Amino acid sequence: MNNFSIISEYKPAGDQPKAIDEIIAGLSSKKRSQMLLGITGSGKTFTMANIIERTNRPTLIMAHNKTLAAQIYSEMKSLFPKNAVEYFVSYYDYYQPEAYIARTDTFIEKDSSINEQIDLMRHAATRSLLERRDVIVVSSVSCIYGLGSPDLYYQMMVNLEPGQSYPRDQLLNDLINLQYERNDIGFERGCFRVKGDNIDIFPSHYSDKAWRLSFFGNELEYIHEFDPLTGEKLAKLDKAMVFGNSHFVMPQETVNNAISGIEEELQKRLEFLKSQDKPLETQRLNQRTQYDLEMLTETGSCKGVENYSRFFTGRNAGEPPPTLFEYLPEDALLFVDESHVSVPQIRAMYNGDRARKKVLVEHGFRLPSALDNRPLKFEEWDKFRPQTVFVSATPGPFELEETGGTVVELIIRPTGLLDPECIIKPATNQVEDLISEIQTTIAQGFRVLVTTLTKKMAEDLTAYLQELKYKTSYLHSNVHTLERIEILRDLRQGTIDVLVGINLLREGLDIPECGLVAILDADKEGFLRSEVSLIQTIGRAARNSAGRVILYADKMTKSIDKAVSETLRRRQIQQEYNEKHGIIPKTINRAIHALAEFEKIDSKLDKKQAHTLFDNPAKLKTHIDKLKKEMLKAASNLEFEQAVKLRDQLKTLEEAALELS
């Protein structure tokens, strides 16, 4: 068994050694939950890595979105080059779930686009968890959604070893049952081919390696790993384990049992709908389900097969579905990053999913068992999670309750940077005072971030500052990803001096050039001016050694008092540490990366407009990718009509892209 081994020129410093020791002591004493309070720039990921190395336990790290998960995955991959670091997020580039809008009698079919690379990485993650112990899986919160049963996944695995006998027809049949396709011409991931005494398999978890099985009669003589593009032999293997090309593979007996269960539920549901005098729903459900049953009988699968997952996994109604958590060993370790965001997300996912599916069941589009194809309820996740370390600069109520309010702190930054100075000024005449502060900050060569309470206020303030000839821009939720990057680049370069926003902490801004963060109407209690929001916003000025924060308030609220007191407490600890060790804080100098050319155009295009506005396929693809992100956002917000409109626009643009290419 391989042990975890960090490869890095850095060693734990500042608060890190103490924090690592405290967390490990808590794990050793069987504490189920611990809280690692790490401020921005304190080295939380490096601290997590050292805890993993010291405990030597398989680990799952949950992040609240794909972007953050990818960041952590990249860092862990560089720290643990000799161990299995895997990435497990939703493999959909675009996902429009089935939905029914009763008020317009509109049924929207499921539509999705699967990212092959992410699907490969998901297979690599589950395979690693079943094959070895030195595994780190970095996942988004989507890991609480249903996945194929690990028992069936492992049970159907084909174990190959040289010297063993494998009847040829049986082996080929086993590969087909694993949902591998025979393709003797086009050899790609998830396929196998037969040439004489050789069988080549392209495993589902590889993109650039395949296996060649060399037989003498029924005896397997050799297993060679080779490059599927060049045919070059890369290694000779002692064994090979072939897992399913899908996480939902199952033996024929399981399929037959599932069909019987579906038929039984269908009859009960049809009787119920008839008793409710719902002929349309009765006919619709019978027609749709009978078609699915025919497909299952003939092919072993059907469109939307996941809606029958309860029958395939042998679970009872209401029982939790199998998820990635069932692939983890009993002694696994869990980190929940940015837990103040991740935990509420986990809590909300079940209700959103059930609300949509309940409508489908009520109107005869699905059987009630479709409700069991779902994410875990929060209580189920809480029950299944192994020993857990929550990680956040601003812990939420659940984490604090679970840990009894005890936190392990990471306050000292390796750079020596201090938390910013906080100044409270009256909200009366706040705009006039802000203008004076903007002048002073710009004269020092720094930038300014201003956060307001409403969109109208942000728009008016931006327009007013522009009238006064200040280079000002406005960042809001309708700004698309590439435009947002462009605005931030302009801010860092000095093309923009002032950036106004409503919820800047959500935007995740890290601007080393920011010398001032101004929080208008800081005394208006609510989500945008809560203790957590204020601390996160104050942190935007922590990348600059001269960073300041001004909170405009006519009264001292509990949130302001707690946020400012906490910032001052951290600042004093950091100052004392720097004085003791002779550290001089220095602003972080990060390179400003150039953006590719970006076309700002209206999203409502026809083919002719697409040809006119995009003079090459690359530019058109950029816009198509942007629309896909908008579709994903609309679908996740349950805005199904908008998602369908965007999907129709995409089809037109994709036809144009095909012609352009």
UniProtKB/Swiss-Prot annotation:
InterPro entries from the UniProt entry: Helicase/UvrB_N (IPR006935), Helicase_ATP-bd (IPR014001), Helicase_C-like (IPR001650), P-loop_NTPase (IPR027417), UVR_dom (IPR001943), UVR_dom_sf (IPR036876), UvrB (IPR004807), UvrB_inter (IPR041471)
PROSITE patterns: HELICASE_ATP_BIND_1 (PS51192), HELICASE_CTER (PS51194), UVR (PS50151)
Motif Beta-hairpin mapped to chain: 91-114
CDD domains: DEXHc_UvrB, SF2_C_UvrB
Chain ranges of the Helicase ATP-binding domain: 25-414
Sites where the protein binds ATP: G38, I39, T40, G41, S42, G43, K44, T45
Keyword field contains DNA repair: yes
UniProtKB keywords: ATP-binding, Cytoplasm, DNA damage, DNA excision, DNA repair, Excision nuclease, Nucleotide-binding, SOS response
Membership in a protein family: Belongs to the UvrB family.
Domain notes: The beta-hairpin motif is involved in DNA binding.
Protein name: UvrABC system protein B
Source species: Rickettsia conorii (strain ATCC VR-613 / Malish 7)
Gene name of this polypeptide: uvrB
